Amino acid sequence: MKRLNSQLQEDGAPMELILLLRTLLAGCKEISFRVSQGALAGVLGSTLSENVQGETQKKLDVISNQILKDILSESGYVKAISSEEEDDVVACNPNGNYLVSFDPLDGSSNTDINSLIGTIFSITHAPQWMDADDPSAFLQPGTQIVAAGYVLYGPSAMLALSTGRGTHLYTLDKTHGGFLLTQKNIQVPAQTSEFAINASNQRHWEDPVQNYIGDLIAGEDGPREKDFNMRWVAAMVGDIHRVLSRGGIFMYPFDRRNPEMPGKLRLLYEANPMAFLMEQAGGLASTGQGRILEVMPTEIHQRVPVILGSKEEVETCLSYYKA
């Protein structure tokens, strides 16, 4: 099987980006080990602190964030990082050429039940005229991403990665410690009969989403004339991995509870990297009003609605917004 380095070189990734990705993934391998230790290492459960999002931090949130912050700060390739667990950007090397945004442990509420979790990341070029601690450096649309991916910590540790030449899947070979290519240029099926949404929020959805999901649930007796199954992992990384692997539509739409907060998922380190992977695999990614990758960020922890997955199904969903 082909190793990660070989595939990155084939895809034309510059050497410095390859070295940065290797550094980042070394941190992810350390996180994978910590996750696998679980209760044996005393890393389960919550801390007494909250992150900038107002969310109670799990112990593994804090550990994972520190691992990535340390390894990226020391690499020399990174000018600054932005993380879900950090209030502000973290300055690294003033001469670094890249910015890295990440969610160190997506789905961390699943740690205590031994369910799917993962690390999500995106990389952009660092504007050389900006200071390393200037958050405006990160306010670039997703179209500027040079690499994005996630590592899923499941029965095996799997990496989904794109540098703009397709989305590839790799599996961590724990015997030799490297990621091996296991699926090249994955293509998301254009059609699907699966959808992923947190149905407990149904009463808060806007009419287009209410109507669309209602038609899916109606199944073969409704206007879609076929049955759909709902899947929900409660970790974006797990749901997106399923969609990439076998198709589907994933939704975390705007709801009416807080008009000042247009979505649940963060643009820089959740929505953008997943949208990049999905488009590179032939899928679509939208806010309901436009392409996710074209959203111009206004702050590093900005949230957006998310609809992404199988091309034809996302197009069908978006047609409800135009009705």
Swiss-Prot record:
It holds the Pfam family FBPase_C. Mg(2+) 1 binds at residues 84, 103, 105. Mg(2+) 2 binds at residues 103, 106, 270. It is found in: Cytoplasm. GO terms for cellular component: cytosol. Its EC number is 3.1.3.11. InterPro entries: FBPase_C_dom, FBPase_class-1, FBPase_N, FBPtase, Fructose_bisphosphatase_AS. Binds 2 magnesium ions per subunit. Keywords: Carbohydrate metabolism, Cytoplasm, Hydrolase, Magnesium, Metal-binding. Substrate binds at residues 106-109, 198, 264. SUPFAM superfamilies: Carbohydrate phosphatase. GO terms for molecular function: fructose 1,6-bisphosphate 1-phosphatase activity; magnesium ion binding. Signal peptide: none annotated. Its cofactor is Mg(2+). One of its GO terms (biological process) is fructose 6-phosphate metabolic process. Pathway: Carbohydrate biosynthesis; gluconeogenesis. Belongs to the FBPase class 1 family. PANTHER family: FRUCTOSE-1,6-BISPHOSPHATASE-RELATED, SEDOHEPTULOSE-1,7-BISPHOSPHATASE, CHLOROPLASTIC. HAMAP family: FBPase_class1 (MF_01855). Homotetramer. NCBIfam families: PRK09293.1-3, PRK09293.1-4. This is Fructose-1,6-bisphosphatase class 1. It comes from Pseudoalteromonas atlantica (strain T6c / ATCC BAA-1087). The gene is fbp.
